[in-house]
């Protein structure tokens, strides 16, 4: 594996190791070449310190940096904010399950309707996902 450290039941490479691995190595893990290039770009940004993915960072600036990466759109940026930044107001407005659960077809309308859930929209997203899986 590519990791410098291991935890019980967990072994994951550092951002620098992923960045150095190259897109071909990432693609061999079953990831499409385009996504592999996105993963490499993200890893390089994190390894260089240009992108910090930790709770407490400026969320808006981090979302902007994420969306500037190749292959990273609003869904991916908000998902990373929800998980890595632990941002409770992340909202995946163009998520198919979210749109269906909200009986919406347009992300802009889902975004507007979600205003009532601020600042806890990430919890609403998880609730909608959970409801769809049962």
Task: Please state what every model-predicted region is.
Residues 1-134:
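HhH-family (HhH-GPD) DNA N-glycosylase catalytic core used in base-excision repair
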